[in-house]
């Protein structure tokens, strides 16, 4: 059976149309009313046939019915509870936006659990960072001390190479050299007659005096006697060393 066959099937009312007794004219009001009734009845089976065809098409989607059984009920739509469960409503979304975030997180948007974990990690990492900071400071202080000692050793290395005895020897030699020059000058002045002054010598040996000159030539400054005695010279040198090197 096709949909078109059901739509075009004539109704029983269309076959029997009462004819007015007054001659059966086509343009009479009774005949027009009969035609209107027939057209309405034709429309009703056609619409019912279309709905039946739609039901059969919808039934093709669902499992096939048993043989010879027509589909007379239209499948209902799925309940809206499933869609509402999948898609939350406006009220639920508003609650999630307002209450859900306040429950899951604080004002900064950080979850409470994460905050506690971060605080604990910070407490644990704080002593470690302090220990590392102390180690770095100690290593830096040790490096600074080593660098300072190396600089001091580099500055005082020439002086440390020479012992204090060597310094004293150098001072003694310098003192002896200065006194030796003075002594040599005095000896040369006394050896040549007429060159020495009255302050250095009490008498002058001239040609006129000859060998009979008994005037003793004595040095009032006492440099010759001081230089001849080694102990006095060493004492002078030690005093100079004490002045130059108090330590």
Swiss-Prot record:
Residues 1-67, 80-110 are annotated as: Disordered. Keywords: Cytoplasm, Phosphoprotein, Secreted, Transcription, Transcription regulation. The modification Phosphoserine is found at residues 129, 141. GO terms for biological process: negative regulation of DNA-templated transcription; negative regulation of protein import into nucleus; positive regulation of DNA-templated transcription; positive regulation of viral transcription; regulation of JNK cascade; regulation of Wnt signaling pathway. Residues 74-247 form the MDFI domain. In the embryo, robust expression is detected between 16.5 and 18.5 dpc in lung, kidney, and salivary glands. In the developing cardiovascular system, it is detected in lymphatic and cardiac valves (at protein level). GO terms for cellular component: cytoplasm; extracellular region; nucleolus; nucleus; plasma membrane. Palmitoylated. It is found in: Cytoplasm; Secreted. Interacts with HAND1; the interaction sequesters Hand1 into the nucleolus and inhibits its activity. Interacts (via C-terminus) with ZIC2. Interacts (via C-terminus) with AXIN1, the histidine-rich region of CCNT1/cyclin-T and weakly with LEF1. Interacts with CCNT2. Interacts with GATA2. Interacts (via C-terminus) with Piezo channel composed of PIEZO1 or PIEZO2; the interaction prolongs Piezo channel inactivation. Belongs to the MDFI family. The cysteine-rich C-terminus is involved in its granular distribution in the cytoplasm. The cysteine-rich C-terminus mediates protein-protein interactions, including interaction with HIV-1 Tat, transcription factors, AXIN1, CCNT1. This is MyoD family inhibitor domain-containing protein. It comes from Mus musculus (Mouse). The lineage of its organism: Eukaryota, Metazoa, Chordata, Craniata, Vertebrata.
């Amino acid at each position: 059976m096709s949909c078109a066959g059901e739509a075009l099937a004539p109704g029983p009312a269309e076959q029997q149309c009462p004819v007015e007794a007054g001659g059966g004219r086509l343009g009479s009001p009774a005949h027009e009313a009969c035609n209107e009734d027939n057209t309405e009845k034709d429309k009703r089976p056609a619409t019912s046939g279309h709905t039946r065809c739609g039901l059969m098409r919808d039934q093709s989607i669902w499992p096939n019915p048993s043989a010879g059984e027509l589909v007379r009920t239209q499948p209902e739509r799925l309940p809206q509870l499933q869609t509402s469960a999948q898609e939350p409503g406006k009220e639920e979304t508003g609650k999630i936006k307002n209450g859900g975030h306040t429950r899951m997180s604080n004002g900064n948007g950080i979850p409470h659990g994460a905050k506690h974990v971060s605080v604990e990690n910070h407490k644990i990492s704080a002593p470690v960072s302090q220990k590392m900071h102390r180690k770095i400071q100690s290593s830096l202080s040790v490096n600074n001390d080593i660098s300072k000692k190396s600089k001091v050793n580099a500055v005082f290395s020439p002086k440390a190479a020479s012992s204090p005895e060597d310094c004293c020897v150098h001072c003694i030699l310098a003192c002896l050299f200065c006194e030796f020059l003075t002594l040599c000058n005095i000896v040369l002045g006394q050896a040549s007659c007429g060159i020495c002054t009255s302050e250095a010598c009490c008498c002058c040996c001239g040609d006129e005096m000859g060998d009979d000159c008994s005037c003793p030539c004595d040095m009032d400054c006492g440099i010759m006697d001081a230089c001849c005695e080694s102990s006095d010279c060493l004492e002078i040198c030690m005093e100079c060393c004490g002045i130059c090197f108090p330590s």
